Amino acid sequence: MIYVDADACPVKPEILKVAERHGLEVTFVANSGLRPSRDPMVRNVIVSAGFDAADDWIAERAKDGDIVVTADVPLAVRCVGAGALVTGPTGRVFDETNIGMASAMRDLSAHLRETGESKGYNAALTSRDRSAFLETLDRLCRRVKR
């Protein structure tokens, strides 16, 4: 199973492509509108607009043998702790060896934004990022199928 934190996820088409190739189910979870899919391997879940509702839904279900796609570091922390394989939309893998540092960097960035030291702009996703994501997701899919 691939769980996707789908609000503002820029790699949905890539996820569908890789999941289809590997025969894995995909669940897109969001607070609002998702495009319907006729594919029986794709499920859309709309959660309440509450704070972290999509994150909570995914974190309550993700387990060993699942893949989670998210750019949200706190969600990644929870899913890594549950044994899931986690990647961001740029192909960055979050695991037990780097999730602590990712969380610390997120907290530092939030502090810098609050103090006005940083504007907090996120770079646009590049074609190189998309390629790295495709490679990472393909590798994670092969790993869960073993």
Curated annotation (Swiss-Prot):
Coiled coil: none
Annotated Pfam families: DUF188 (PF02639)
Protein name as it appears in the record: UPF0178 protein R01393
InterPro entries the UniProt entry points to: UPF0178
CDD domains to which the protein is assigned, alphabetical: PIN_YqxD-like (cd18720)
HAMAP family, A to Z: UPF0178
Source species, domain of life: Bacteria
UniProt similarity note: Belongs to the UPF0178 family.
